[in-house]
Amino acid sequence: MSNKKADSKPQARYPVNLLDTPFPMRGDLPRREPQWVKDWQERKIYEKIRAASKGRKKFILHDGPPYANGDIHLGHAVNKILKDMIVKARNLAGFDAVYVPGWDCHGMPIEIQIEKQFGKSLPAAEVMQKARAYATEQIEKQKAGFRRLGVLGDWDNPYKTMNFANEAGEIRALAKIMEKGYVFRGLKPVNWCFDCGSALAEAEVEYKDKTDPTIDVMFTFADPEKTAHAFGLAALPRNEGGIVIWTTTPWTIPANQALNLHPEIVYALVDTPRGLLILAEERVEACLKSYGIAGTVIATAPGAKLANLRFNHPLASAHPSYKRTSPVYLGDYVTTETGTGIVHSSPAYGVEDFISCKTHGMADSDILSPVMGDGRYIESLALFGGLSIWDANPKIVEALDEAGTLLRTEKYLHSYMHCWRHKTPIIYRATSQWFAGMDIKPNDSDKTLRETALEGIEATAFYPSWGKQRLFAMIANRPDWTLSRQRQWGVPMAFFVHKETGELHPRTLELLEEVAKRVEVSGIEAWQTLDPRELIGDDANMYEKNRDTLDVWFDSGTTHWHVLRGSHKDELQFPADLYLEGSDQHRGWFHSSLLTASMLDGRPPYNALLTHGFTVDGEGRKMSKSLGNGIDPHEVSNRLGAEIIRLWIASTDYSGELAISEEILKRVTESYRRIRNTLRFLLANLSDFDIGKHARPVGEWLEIDRYAVALTANLQADILSHYDRYEFHPVVAKLQTFCSEDLGGFYLDVLKDRLYTTAADSKARRSAQTALYHIAHGLLRLMAPFLSFTAEEAWKVFQPQSETIYTETYHAYPDVPEASTLLDKWTLLRAVRSDVTKALEEARVANQIGSSLQAEVEIRAAGARHDALASLGADLKFVLITSGATVVKVDSVDEEGVDVITSKYLKCERCWHYRKDVGESAEHPTLCGRCISNLFGNGETRSAA
């Protein structure tokens, strides 16, 4: 480093070694950071990191792809910066840590954008063309945003799920799981969005409050005699009445086909003014009170006794088409927490309902499904045909009332399923879909998909650890995976289906490979334009192309297949070392990736999962437009610098919510300023130091320098253990403490006298600089993962011949002899120094002294304290920053103490110490003897400090 003395200032009569540095005090981050981003791109720094890391053990953090739609938000910034910190830390630790960013490109959000811009009547080929163009534009915008945050990666070669190779890879993954026997077609209730016109994945469902009408409805007796016998009666006292259900979905009543009771719950036959009512015994009092009637229990029976009884549909008297009966089935899922203890069953619109009816022998063809994909009833449905189910709710309530079967209705606020895109209510709807069976045993294993996935979870490391139980519970309880979607912009389930039987073509696996080859060349458009005769010849008369597309969670969930081992197999590898996403991805990408890898490989695609929380404001509230509490990372970068966002993320415990506000950013900015000032001090005092010319061997270092380097080496070992566990907030906290207390509050404070006043090339000063050189090397590398711009800026000043700090590895410190003993000794000395500092402050408050250099101290110490202090000799005063220090040995701790004496000597003009020899030199009457020696003689000698 070159000597940068402040030439603009007039030359002092007795100069000190006060050096300058081109590393400025002010970061000016909003202006400088974009210059570094441009510089990294132009100099191809990521490629140079790869070249420097070639041949090392790989570390693969596989990027969970953000959706290619819209500007990046603060959640994106948290996610990408956490990934960037880990990748940089792993590279510095000596790994070949590759980072290939990716994007999720297919699916509803982009299709909606195309519909908004161009309408809904575009042909499929044009939808795909415009969707590709839109996704490409969004990717470029997001890419620029991520680069601006200081994230280094293979931005020129990212993976995109819409790349032809990746689309083809998905089709091949589908073929593989079909070959193993996981895929089947069936009628099942699935999450259905009317606005999407498609099934939804579990991860695409969110819950919001919704107000619905609840109804208590009576299904009248169809066979009074059997009902009487079930309750142990010879006959019913009268035949009026029935069994009562409670539901929050009146729109499902037209499709009712059964009633469900718990086999062990006791049910009561109650005589009331509305007839004989069957209710769960423990719900009788609450129900009758809500109906405003009195009643008497005349018989009871467990649910098991009532199995297979039949009751009339509650609209039977309203229209002939409802003149049917509903049987009683038993189900363990029925409870008495709310309602009547009886559940009405519409198998097309409820998972338990469907399972119960199928278990009792109901055929798919017998299941009533009057609700169409757009949320309207089929025109042929009596009384309500053509109505939206939500509009039909009040009309159904009215019809039940007129039929005499409505006992009660009220408005009910409850948490209800909504589409995450449209924010509109969704339903369960039985449709014919393609599924991956959770409880299917493939033809190459004796374990079901669920069992394989759960075993995989046990073998995975989780950060934080609670993520394991969360994912385990989700997999343990989830239904079969609905793979199919009814959309255009997605990877096709490229099957040929028999027009009459619905069976797949016998050559399906072979045909999927043929389609994949075409998609690899021309994209998924190749399936749209494919003439079936090209592949199946005359069979095209009997088969039609399946129009379903794959769930977009299959797109991203198979990136371990078509990216790690496909489009980017040369850069990446399977399994990945780490997947890192927000906590919502336990039911999203973590989840779908686990299932696909369990099917394809019998193991998870990752060795570890890291979960981070969501951003909230300073009061812990979720960020939203309505609250106006959102924080835009682009705005913060332009106002304060991306480095402040990075430092905020690194200093926050990401395992919980990440709170941010202007006040928090202000505190982070102040923390950054203190770190920057520490770096500036180090760089300034190393600006005339050349390691090749000026370095001193460890054996010649002053004792405090050996201590400081040993302390920094210990800090590095501690911090690297945190980096290994992906813990960043302890790293920041310990570095901040080190900079402010160990360096600023102690070592650098003590060092200033030696750096500034001893001869420029003296052993004492070069010893200090050699220590500072190692400390600077260590600190810059330790900070580089999170303070990326600042570390690089400081590095280019510190090591201008080096291309970038990111091709380095963590600093190798020289071995300090007897480091442990040294650390213990100086821990004790610093404790004494704290006592002295307190005594000096008391003297200052009492106006006994001004600065600490105006004081001399006498320390009474016993045992090890005395020995440690005495070992420093004349250098003790430099450690205490006083003009004199003496140590008096005492016998016990009780006698220990500090006396502060105001110095009676004159102050040296140059070093500001009060010394007896100031004025003894006629030639330099304002200087002390050591300054005269340091300036004009052989220089002072120091051994400890």
Curated annotation (Swiss-Prot):
GO molecular-function terms, A-Z: aminoacyl-tRNA deacylase activity; ATP binding; isoleucine-tRNA ligase activity; tRNA binding; zinc ion binding
Cofactor note text: Binds 1 zinc ion per subunit.
Cross-referenced Pfam families: Anticodon_1, tRNA-synt_1, zf-FPG_IleRS
SUPFAM superfamilies in UniProt: Anticodon-binding domain of a subclass of class I aminoacyl-tRNA synthetases, Nucleotidylyl transferase, ValRS/IleRS/LeuRS editing domain
Binding positions (L-isoleucyl-5'-AMP): E581
Binding positions for ATP per the UniProt entry: K625
Any one GO biological process: isoleucyl-tRNA aminoacylation
Compartment(s) where it occurs, according to its Swiss-Prot or TrEMBL record: Cytoplasm
GO CC annotations on file: cytosol
Residues at which Zn(2+) binds: C908, C911, C928, C931
CDD domains, A to Z: Anticodon_Ia_Ile_BEm, IleRS_core
InterPro entries documented for this protein: aa-tRNA-synth_I_CS, aa-tRNA-synth_Ia, Anticodon_Ile_BEm, Ile-tRNA-ligase, Ile-tRNA-ligase_type1, Ile-tRNA_ligase, M/V/L/I-tRNA-synth_anticd-bd, Rossmann-like_a/b/a_fold
Keywords: Aminoacyl-tRNA synthetase, ATP-binding, Cytoplasm, Ligase, Metal-binding, Nucleotide-binding, Protein biosynthesis, Zinc
Intervals of motif 'HIGH' region: 66-76
Catalytic reaction list: tRNA(Ile) + L-isoleucine + ATP = L-isoleucyl-tRNA(Ile) + AMP + diphosphate
Motif ('KMSKS' region) on chain: 622-626
EC code: 6.1.1.5
Cofactor requirements of the protein: Zn(2+)
Enzyme class: ligase
Subunit structure: Monomer.
Domain notes: IleRS has two distinct active sites: one for aminoacylation and one for editing. The misactivated valine is translocated from the active site to the editing site, which sterically excludes the correctly activated isoleucine. The single editing site contains two valyl binding pockets, one specific for each substrate (Val-AMP or Val-tRNA(Ile)).
Family: Belongs to the class-I aminoacyl-tRNA synthetase family. IleS type 1 subfamily.
Function: Catalyzes the attachment of isoleucine to tRNA(Ile). As IleRS can inadvertently accommodate and process structurally similar amino acids such as valine, to avoid such errors it has two additional distinct tRNA(Ile)-dependent editing activities. One activity is designated as 'pretransfer' editing and involves the hydrolysis of activated Val-AMP. The other activity is designated 'posttransfer' editing and involves deacylation of mischarged Val-tRNA(Ile).
NCBIfam families listed in its UniProt record: ileS (TIGR00392)
Protein's name in the database: Isoleucine--tRNA ligase
Organism field: Paraburkholderia phymatum (strain DSM 17167 / CIP 108236 / LMG 21445 / STM815)
Gene: ileS
